Each structure stands twice: as structure tokens, then as C-alpha cells.
Amino acid sequence: MGEEAAGVRPELVREAEVSLLECKVCFERFGHRQQRRPRNLPCGHVVCLACVAALAHPRTLALECPFCRRACRACDTSDCLPVLHLLELLGSTLHASPAALSAASCAPGALTCYHAFGGWGTLVNPTGLALCPKTGRVVVVHDGKRRVKIFDSGGGGAHQFGEKGDAAHDVKYPLDVAVTNDCHVVVTDAGDCSLKVFDFFGQIKLVVGKQFSLPWGVEITPHNGVLVTDAEAGTLHLLEADFPEGVLRRIERLQAHLCNPRGVAVSWLTGAIAVLEHPCALGTSSGNNTRVKVFNSSMQLIGQVDSFGLNLLFPSKITASAVTFDHQGNVIVADTSGPAIVCLGKPEEFPALKPMVTHGLSRPVALVFTKENSLLVLDSASHSIKVFKVMEGNGG
């Protein structure tokens, strides 16, 4: 496409830029970033999303087309795909805006797989992955006889605990795992709908039950709190505890009315919290429709994007199975449809789509960045952890 566009006469490109690729309300150029996306009004006229928001009534969302005065509502607008495709076709020949250059400069680099460990037998149908912030050890929960397996940072020296059984301290069906700042392992157990905390030697420290209907995703905050999603109740909880003493200090519901929330992640840079929802659409598989919501540290919604919105930007279907933040505050998701790892950009830029890994994965289900900026991906199809290194200078 870039070569074809390069052969287009400059005057035609300029004419297209002025006549077709510019919002005639604010005279800003259309783009793929959220505020500049071209939106079709029901009458056929096209304006940018920022102008739709500015023209719409704050409560009723009613607006009039600025050109023909036909009434409609903001929710009646849709992405103008011909303009988006034209932007893609002529992208390399258009004059890059400073904002676009800034966005490109902070995008993460390309990733290359340079190590893998685990494999069938060592791991069996793994579901969750975490890193110990102090030691760099890798913790995985899976369907083996002992549910929790701990590797050293290089993938060797594994030890395990968390017997499969019916006792209160056993782990029946682990869904996710996290490691606290003081090296305690936190597991969500769907078998008895509880949250279980172990020390690194496998001694049970705390069991939190009854508060959850189906605890799923778990993550640790910078202040050593525990974030837990409840997929059945549609909630996000924050737990604070004295882990060495095994005492639960308090539990707070941060969000309600979420739709089947599973994965959760927190940015240590900004304090933002990302929640991965699996909305159940009537007559469709819930696993094929996903949505990422990002809240700031005050739990105000600052960005969201769903499978439908992503599929307008990306040539193949995206089904998010896991979410995390990189060290720059970008939201990163695992895609099981690709399979791939995709950067969605910062929440205020949603969706600034950038594929990071498109080869070497079968079914990625969990992600975590190391302090050295390597990316660990849990691949449930190959029952292994794959380590990708950020190749600085290959991105952008």
C-alpha cells in the first residue's frame, strides 16, 4: 500500500487531504486516534468524534448535523470506514502531525522470543502467571497435582505446592495468581470461590471466602493491596491484609455493574487499573466478545475499547484473553484469535493499536513484564512460558 501511495501525484494527495480527510467543522485532519476518528452521521455527512461530542447535548446526546440540520443522537453515529481506509492507503504520503510523531515515539519496540520453559508435564493447562517483585521468580498456577509451581528467573529450579483436594488449604481450581510485595502468593480458587494466600514455602496464611461468587483475576497494587475481580457478581474488590500474620484488615468494593470481569492489571507508573470484561451477547459465545475498561486511581473511567472497535482498526479479529501495563503506562493485551500480543496505547489515546508479537504463540492467556522490560507470556496450548525481549529501535 505504501508503494502504491508513493506513486500518487502530490497535488492529488493534497486535494484528498483537504477535501476528504479533514473535518469541516474543526478543520483538523481525521486520524485513527479516538478524538479524530471520522464518524458518519445518519444523513451521510462526516465529522470527527471530538465534534460529535461537542455538538451533542450532555444529557440527551441529541445533536443536529452542522451542514443539513438533520436531527440525530450521538449514539446513532458510526465509524466512516471509507475515510479510515483512505487514511491507511495514503498514510505514508500524508504530512505527519506532531501529535502522531509523539505517539509513535513512545510506542513500545518490537519483541523477539529468546527463551521458553515449562512444557507439557512440567505444566498442565496453566491459567495464571505472576512475578515475585523482589526475587524475580516466576509463579504459575495450573492443573497439576500441585497447583502452584515456582521457577527461578531463568526457568529452572522449580518447586511446587498447593495440593489438589477438598481441604480448606487445598487448591481446587486455580484461575489466576499474583505475588505480593512481601513475597506471598495469592491464588483465586474457583473450586470453593475463595482467595488463598500462601508464603513462598507453601504454608497457607489466609483464606478469604464467602465474600465472592466467582473470584477470577487477581493483581497487587503498589501499596500491597490485592485487587480481585468477581466474574459472577460483576465486581472489583480491594483487599488489605497483614499477610505474614494472616489477618484480613479490610475489603472494599471498588466497582460494581461490571460485565463478567476476569483479568485485572494495575499500572505502577500511574495507578490506573485495567479490567478485562467478557460481555455475554445473546446467541453468541461470551469468549468472542471482550472489552477493556481503564480506570484512574480514583476509579473514574478514563478509557475503554471492545472487540468490535478493535476489529474496525485491525484486519483480523481480536479476542482479548489477558491484560497488563508496560513500564510506560501502555495497555497491552493478549489476543487468542491472532494469536498475538497487541499494544492498545495509553488510555487517553484509545485505541492506538500496535501489534507487538504476531508469531510464536498458540494460545496466550497471561502476561507480565519484568523489571528488565522483557515480556513473559503464558501459552496454555504449549503449556509453557515464553520470554520476549524488547528490541529497542525496532519499534515505531
Curated annotation (Swiss-Prot):
An example Gene Ontology CC term for this record: perinuclear region of cytoplasm
Main localization, broad class: endoplasmic reticulum
Protein location: Endoplasmic reticulum; Nucleus
Gene3D superfamilies (UniProt xref): TolB, C-terminal domain, Zinc/RING finger domain, C3HC4 (zinc finger)
Record keywords: Autophagy, Endoplasmic reticulum, Metal-binding, Nucleus, Repeat, Transferase, Ubl conjugation pathway, Zinc, Zinc-finger
InterPro entries: 6-blade_b-propeller_TolB-like, NHL_repeat, TRIM-NHL_E3_ligases, Znf_RING, Znf_RING/FYVE/PHD, Znf_RING_CS
Entry superkingdom: Eukaryota
Pathway(s) of this molecule: Protein modification; protein ubiquitination
Zinc finger (RING-type) boundaries: 23-69
GO molecular function, one term: zinc ion binding
Protein role: E3 ubiquitin-protein ligase. Together with the phosphatase EPM2A/laforin, appears to be involved in the clearance of toxic polyglucosan and protein aggregates via multiple pathways. In complex with EPM2A/laforin and HSP70, suppresses the cellular toxicity of misfolded proteins by promoting their degradation through the ubiquitin-proteasome system (UPS). Ubiquitinates the glycogen-targeting protein phosphatase subunits PPP1R3C/PTG and PPP1R3D in a laforin-dependent manner and targets them for proteasome-dependent degradation, thus decreasing glycogen accumulation.
Entry note about domains: The RING domain is essential for ubiquitin E3 ligase activity.
Subunit (UniProt): Interacts with AGL. Interacts (via the NHL repeats) with EPM2A/laforin. Forms a complex with EPM2A/laforin and HSP70.
Protein name stated in the entry: E3 ubiquitin-protein ligase NHLRC1
Gene: Nhlrc1
